[in-house]
């Protein structure tokens, strides 16, 4: 940047640096303080609503060294996105100081809030050192670790803006906080046993039965005895049982109403993880990282079976039936039934470290909620919500501002893929291209969707609130400028919220919107939502738009997937976008999910789609893949299906009366919507192969179909064909806005299904059939 002022005749110069990025809550101010002191520079630093602001005075060559070393030696958890420099006339600072954080009427707060960080090695030494004053203290932290996003109420990141504001530091903690060479220098959650939060153990009625270290010891005894403990952690409660105790795990499943979905397991250390799972170097690095996510690891099976028995639930059995035991590296099959992967994490808070040190065996640590509800964060609320699940509650008095689940990550092709973005990742911004729409016609810049209402000729700056879909919900906010739409290179993405299917989830959805909006003083002037009229997020967007006269942009579900990839990888048109999904509202009145979009400079065209097939029962077919298999075969055979005498397991799972009802529904097109969904195609194939007729969680059938491959590799595959004419006449027009949605080509899956049936009749191995299909 060109200097605003630079006196060549002066030896002393003043340099002002404005730094944006991840620079609050990572020890950045102490780092700058120590660097300035080492270089004998004077001036100051403070947190601002946009990052940090620094002014330093000294010799020109020393100031240049100061700039260079900031970039080279910055704290490990920090990230500098922008560094703006202005030269100013010196004012004669006499010392370097950390000033009180700025609280001005800045037009927009854009400072990056750091996620919660796993306990660092230095703090671990503290809590396991009998001579240390923080010995066995479960809320030990420093500038390199501990709570951040879960406790912050407002920017800038200072103690008085966090839930630690009510805990006054003792003299020892205050000395650490004030000493520039201490690693707790300006560590906002700094605390100790004298002045900080404390543990209590409650019975299921909320009565205190132990406190402090005794609470932790009794909690360990509770887990050893096979009972269920609810533990208040960083971003909410965990439900915990001994992972080796199949009776205890099954009891947790029944109480939590989670009969088959995999449960995460927390191990005391990496050595024990490696006894049960294969761990690559990259996976080990992830497990031990500051984010400390759940990592999906390949399990070690001592006894390999080519065709293992399926749990009764996957065959459509009753929920109170037990899962068959599976011999493997230590854990029973009930933690992750018929699944070659295990969701594994390591202790990431002092509470978890201290508890696991006492137990020295793996524990199930699943979200503290009923299935499909948001995680519980408040100790008063938990006694009401979870007292039918947990036998005891290990709680503390440090408030949690917002629920944050554990993140889930899987390594695919030696690259990290985040499957659930929450603790350790949120709310770090997602990088965006420098601009969206540059060098493109104005109509394309502002109409990035299929339909819109309201005036989109917004005065800059643009502030977008994007509300996501219905399942696995998240929201995002972005700041930008018109012509072209530029977003400061980032959008702030919330933590995983969950499925918007009950009042608690809807309340959590609104609270996340309010929370992010309050932190960033964010008032949107454009609302973006899914095009599905029945989604809660869409209805919320419409109400918000009407109340505040915000324009609203509705984006077709699968087109949103394509746009997300375009933005993530900064891809220029023309391009082909392929979106294969479970369910999405189609503009032709059908359910989309296997779509091919041609994206050019001026138009978006749905050029191809999977051949449609009926879903008997609509949404009910999602939980009963056997209905999908029936719809696939009916599309091919019509009523001959019911007279064919096919000896297929999925047909036998229906009672005769049920089959008659299904036939009537299909013939009369009663509650049998058409779909092009690839996700539903996978579900139907799983049922055709007898792998899975009913599921208790979304995606269960497709997972089981993938796992049936059992590491088999083959060059064989099933053929498919393309249809070059529209499958069905459409009632609506060919185009909406700048998008054509009437597909010309259809991928015909008929040969695939016929090939699968032929292989099944010829008794080919299930793993081969699944591998050929994939």
Regions found by a protein language model. Give the residues of each.
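A phosphate-binding glycine/aspartate-rich beta-alpha loop in the early core of alpha/beta enzymes
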Residues: 228, 236-301
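Intrinsically disordered, low-complexity, mixed-charge
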Residues: 1-189, 193, 197-200
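Short glycine-rich phosphate-binding loop at a beta-alpha junction
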Residues: 230, 363, 521-534, 552-553
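A contiguous, well-structured pocket-lining segment that forms one wall/lid of small-molecule binding clefts
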Residues: 189, 196-198, 469-483, 487-515, ...
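Glycine-biased, low-complexity coil/linker segments
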Residues: 314-318, 328-330, 438, 453-454, ...
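Active-site histidine-anchored catalytic micro-motif
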Residues: 566-634, 639, 643, 667, ...
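Conserved phosphate-binding catalytic cores of ATP/NTP-utilizing and phosphoryl-transfer enzymes
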Residues: 274-279, 354, 375-384, 428-436, ...
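Internal gly/pro-rich beta-alpha loop/helix module
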Residues: 359-434, 670, 674-675
């Amino acid at each position: 940047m060109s200097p605003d002022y630079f006196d060549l005749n002066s030896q002393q110069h003043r340099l002002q640096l404005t730094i944006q990025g991840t620079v609050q809550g990572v020890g950045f101010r102490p780092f700058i303080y120590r660097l300035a002191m080492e270089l004998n520079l004077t001036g100051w630093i403070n947190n601002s609503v946009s990052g940090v602001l620094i002014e330093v005075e000294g010799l020109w060559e020393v100031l240049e060294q100061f700039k260079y070393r900031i970039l080279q030696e910055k704290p490990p958890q920090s990230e500098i996105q922008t560094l703006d420099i202005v030269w100013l006339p010196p004012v004669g600072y006499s010392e370097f100081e950390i000033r009180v954080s700025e609280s001005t009427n800045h037009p927009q707060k854009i400072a990056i809030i750091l996620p919660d960080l796993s306990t660092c090695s230095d703090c671990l030494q503290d809590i396991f050192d009998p001579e240390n004053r923080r010995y066995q203290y479960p809320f030990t932290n420093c500038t390199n670790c501990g709570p951040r996003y879960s406790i912050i109420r407002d920017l800038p990141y200072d103690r008085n803006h966090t839930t630690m504001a009510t805990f006054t530091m003792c003299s020892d903690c205050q000395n650490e906080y004030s000493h520039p060479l201490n690693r707790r220098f300006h560590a906002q959650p700094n605390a100790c046993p004298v002045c900080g939060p404390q543990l209590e153990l409650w019975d299921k009625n909320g009565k205190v039965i132990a406190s402090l270290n005794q609470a932790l010891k009794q909690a360990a005894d509770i887990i050893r005895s096979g009972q269920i403990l609810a533990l208040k952690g960083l971003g909410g409660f965990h439900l915990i049982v001994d992972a080796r105790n199949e009776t205890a795990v099954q009891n947790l499943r029944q109480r939590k109403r989670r009969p088959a979905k995999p449960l995460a397991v927390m191990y005391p250390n990496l050595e024990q993880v490696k006894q049960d799972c294969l761990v690559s170097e990259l996976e080990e690095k992830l497990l031990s990282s500051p984010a400390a996510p759940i990592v999906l690891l390949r399990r070690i099976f001592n006894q390999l079976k080519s065709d293992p028995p399926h749990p009764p639930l996957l065959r459509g059995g009753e929920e109170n039936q037990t899962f068959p035991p599976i011999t493997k590296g230590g854990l029973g099959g009930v933690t992750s039934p018929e699944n070659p992967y295990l969701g594994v994490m390591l202790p990431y808070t002092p509470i978890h470290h201290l508890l696991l040190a006492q137990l020295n065996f793996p524990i199930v640590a699943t979200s503290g909620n009923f299935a499909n509800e948001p995680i519980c964060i408040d100790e008063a609320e938990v006694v009401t919500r979870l007292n039918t699940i947990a036998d005891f509650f290990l709680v503390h008095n440090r408030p949690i501002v917002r629920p944050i689940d554990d993140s889930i990550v899987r390594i695919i092709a030696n690259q990290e893929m985040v499957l659930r973005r929450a603790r350790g990742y949120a709310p770090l911004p997602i990088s965006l291209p420098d601009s969206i729409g540059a060098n493109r016609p104005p109509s394309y810049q502002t109409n990035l969707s299929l339909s819109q209402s309201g005036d989109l000729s917004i005065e800059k700056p643009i502030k977008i609130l994007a509300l996501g879909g219905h399942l696995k919900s998240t929201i995002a906010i972005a700041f930008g400028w018109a012509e072209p739409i530029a977003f400061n290179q980032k959008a702030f993405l919330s933590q995983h919220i969950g499925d918007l299917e009950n009042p608690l989830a809807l309340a959590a959805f609104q609270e996340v919107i309010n929370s992010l909006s309050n932190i960033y003083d964010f008032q949107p002037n454009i609302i973006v939502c899914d095009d599905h009229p029945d989604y809660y997020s869409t209805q919320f967007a419409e109400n918000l738009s009407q109340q505040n006269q915000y324009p609203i942009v509705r984006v077709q579900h699968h087109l949103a997937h394509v746009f997300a990839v375009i933005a993530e990888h900064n891809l220029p048109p023309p391009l082909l976008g392929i979106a294969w999904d479970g369910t999405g509202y189609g503009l032709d009145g059908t359910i989309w999910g296997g779509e091919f979009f041609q994206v050019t400079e001026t138009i978006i065209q749905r050029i191809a789609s999977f051949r449609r097939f009926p879903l008997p029962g609509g949404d009910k077919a999602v939980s009963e893949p056997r209905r999908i298999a029936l719809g696939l075969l009916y599309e091919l055979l019509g009523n001959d299906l019911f007279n064919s005498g096919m000896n297929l397991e999925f047909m036998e799972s229906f009672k005769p009366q049920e089959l008659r009802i299904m036939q009537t529904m299909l013939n009369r097109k009663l509650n049998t919507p058409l779909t092009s969904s690839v996700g539903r195609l996978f579900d139907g194939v799983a049922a055709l192969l007898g792998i899975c007729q009913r599921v208790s969680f979304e995606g269960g059938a497709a997972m089981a179909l993938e796992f049936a491959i059992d590491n088999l590799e083959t060059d064989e595959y099933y053929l498919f064909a393309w249809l070059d004419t529209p499958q069905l006449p459409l009632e609506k027009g060919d185009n909406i806005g700048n998008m054509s949605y009437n597909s010309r080509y259809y991928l015909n899956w008929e040969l695939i299904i016929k090939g699968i049936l032929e292989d099944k009749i010829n008794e080919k191995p299930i793993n081969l059939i699944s591998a050929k299909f994939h």
